[in-house]
């Protein structure tokens, strides 16, 4: 195996019909029907290499068209294979991606091209679905192309021994850095170990890490390196305009609402740090009067798969709206028409920044992205500039209305808002403490009091990390005159259940108190009796009793 550095080659941008070696007519026709005519840079460079039986390592900006860059040669290589058409359980290609959503999207994009291959069946294998259902599909319908996540793919490969990988032609690892970051190294290694070494391999990623480089050395042969946009000063797509907004923690929510109002007829994606934050802001934003005309959708890693799929499908079909999410949607998802990406919370991993903003300005289109930064976080701008992601400053809007009173009012009127706000705030604080860029996002420098105000918290909660590290809560003003136990759920069934729980808790406490009183009385009597017995067996009384017993024993002997 040649471990020398891959060669870097760039080419001009041809039409798909002009690529050498040529793509089949069926693929060209499928591209025409989908509206694809001219290659993007990454497609122009990658497709000829893979079709010429060369391995590739592709470093491409998110949104550069890399999905077609590996799907088209994937289909072409299988068409030209000596094993084509394959038997039902003869696997000829495998595509691995880190998330269920990305795998499902790749499978969907592949469908019109797979359909050009008679008697070839592609199967999607991801978590969140019944294992038995996947096993039945593989056994009854067969599988020639496998697309899925590492966990489910490796599991099926272990369970379904009748799957034949001996004639596999091509392996694709999409978002390779994320595959390794998410802890899939073991599963990826297992999958690779089951595949023949005489194959084509494509490794695609928007960021190149040492782990990716090590994987390339181990799994690829004489790989060609493709660096899309290598001459550009920016790591992001050319049509993307990136900004940052510096504002105090207690102003972030008001600035966000103002931004959403300005773009109410557009499609936006808003990223938050935690799942609890997505749940909270999804609930709150939809209740703010000035945002009533906007449709909100939410997705995060703790939602079940059906809920995530429904939210993404609804947002995709909508002409406008706002998708609130965590980094579960930061990679690979190609939702058409996204105009704006808002990073309400900067990502813990700086590499994720590129993938987040890559949800817009895809395939040479125009798009905007903005990241909210608190005053002590602005070193992040220089940090990203060094990483070839220039950010332009956007001033805080002076016309933004203060929404904190509105949010607090919502919490007073509905216990669900109150509880979700506390959960979101605490989850953010704990995630912030573990930030990967702690020298920029300093835990000790976090103005936690202002942050709590921005979340609309009514009374500052107990957080062990705050007390332990003696973090000040300057800038927080609690709401006075509120008895928190009296705040009710708007949902009547939830409130009824809460009242029942409160009564049950009070009854239990009263029973415990009565039990303690009875126990105390009994223990007092027992202690008195014990003390009395001890007093009878001490001092002169003990000696007198012993003497009497001795005399009685002597009389018996006599």
Curated annotation (Swiss-Prot):
Gene from which this protein is expressed: RH49
Region called Disordered, residue ranges: 506-558
Basic and acidic residues composition-biased segments: 521-530
Record-listed ATP binding positions: 60-67
Pfam family, one: Helicase_C
Keyword entries, A-Z: ATP-binding, Helicase, Hydrolase, Nucleotide-binding, RNA-binding
Gene Ontology molecular function, alphabetical: ATP binding; ATP hydrolysis activity; RNA binding; RNA helicase activity
Family under the similarity heading: Belongs to the DEAD box helicase family. DDX55/SPB4 subfamily.
Intervals of motif Q motif: 16-44
Swiss-Prot/TrEMBL catalytic activity: ATP + H2O = ADP + phosphate + H(+)
UniProt KW Metal-binding keyword: no
Name of the protein this chain belongs to: DEAD-box ATP-dependent RNA helicase 49
Record-linked PROSITE patterns: DEAD_ATP_HELICASE (PS00039), HELICASE_ATP_BIND_1 (PS51192), HELICASE_CTER (PS51194), Q_MOTIF (PS51195)
Chain intervals with Acidic residues compositional bias: 549-558
Renumbered ranges of motif DEAD box: 174-177
Every Helicase ATP-binding domain range: 47-226
Comment block on domains: The Q motif is unique to and characteristic of the DEAD box family of RNA helicases and controls ATP binding and hydrolysis.
Enzyme nomenclature, EC number: 3.6.4.13
Domain named Helicase C-terminal: residues: 255-402
């Amino acid at each position: 195996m040649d471990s020398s550095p891959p060669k870097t080659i760039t080419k001009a941008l041809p039409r798909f019909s002009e690529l050498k070696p040529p793509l089949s007519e069926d693929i060209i026709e499928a591209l025409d029907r989908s509206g694809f005519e001219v290659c993007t840079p990454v497609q122009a460079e990658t497709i000829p290499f893979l079709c010429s039986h060369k391995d590739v390592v592709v470093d491409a900006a998110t949104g550069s068209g890399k999905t077609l860059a590996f799907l088209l040669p994937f289909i072409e290589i299988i068409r030209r294979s000596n094993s084509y058409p394959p038997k039902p359980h003869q696997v000829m290609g495998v595509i691995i991606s880190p998330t269920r959503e990305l795998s499902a999207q790749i499978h969907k994009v592949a469908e019109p091209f797979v359909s050009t291959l008679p008697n070839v069946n592609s199967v999607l294998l991801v978590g969140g679905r019944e294992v038995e259902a996947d096993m039945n599909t593989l056994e009854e319908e067969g599988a020639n192309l496998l697309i899925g996540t590492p966990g489910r793919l490796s599991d099926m490969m272990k369970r379904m021994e009748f799957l034949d990988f001996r004639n596999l032609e091509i392996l694709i690892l999409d978002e390779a850095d994320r595959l390794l970051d998410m802890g899939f190294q073991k599963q990826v290694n297992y999958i690779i170990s089951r595949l023949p070494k005489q194959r084509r391999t494509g490794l695609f990623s928007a960021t190149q890490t040492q782990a990716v480089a090590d994987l390339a050395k181990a799994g690829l042969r004489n790989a060609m390196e493709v660096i899309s946009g290598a001459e550009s000063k920016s790591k992001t797509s050319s049509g993307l305009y990136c900004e940052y907004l510096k504002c105090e923690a207690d102003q972030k929510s008001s600035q966000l609402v103002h931004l959403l109002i300005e773009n109410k007829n557009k499609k936006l994606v808003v990223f938050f740090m935690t799942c609890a934050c997505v749940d909270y802001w999804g609930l709150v934003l939809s209740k703010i009067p000035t945002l009533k005309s906007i449709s909100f959708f939410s997705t995060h890693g703790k939602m079940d798969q059906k809920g995530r799929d429904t939210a993404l499908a609804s947002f995709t079909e909508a002409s406008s709206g706002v998708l609130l999410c965590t980094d579960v949607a930061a990679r690979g998802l190609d939702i058409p028409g996204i105009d704006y990406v808002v990073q309400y919370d900067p990502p813990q991993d700086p590499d994720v920044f590129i993938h987040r903003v890559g949800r817009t300005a895809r395939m040479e289109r125009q798009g905007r992205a903005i990241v909210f930064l608190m005053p002590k976080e602005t070193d992040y701008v220089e940090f990203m500039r060094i990483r070839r992601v220039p950010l332009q400053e956007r001033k805080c809007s002076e016309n933004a209305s203060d929404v904190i009173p509105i949010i607090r009012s919502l919490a007073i009127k509905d216990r669900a808002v109150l509880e979700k706000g506390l959960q979101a705030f605490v989850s953010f604080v704990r995630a912030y403490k573990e930030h990967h860029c702690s020298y920029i996002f300093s835990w000790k420098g976090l103005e936690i009091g202002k942050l709590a105000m921005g979340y609309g918290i009514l009374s500052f909660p107990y957080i062990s990390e705050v007390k332990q590290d003696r973090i000040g809560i300057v800038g927080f003003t609690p709401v006075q005159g509120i008895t928190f136990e009296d705040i009710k759920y708007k949902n009547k069934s939830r409130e009824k259940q809460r009242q029942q729980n409160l009564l049950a808790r009070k009854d239990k406490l009263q029973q415990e108190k009565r039990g303690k009183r009875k126990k105390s009385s009994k223990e007092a009597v027992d202690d008195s009796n014990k003390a009395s017995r001890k007093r009878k067996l001490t001092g002169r009384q003990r000696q007198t009793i012993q003497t009497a017993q001795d005399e009685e024993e002597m009389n018996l002997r006599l």
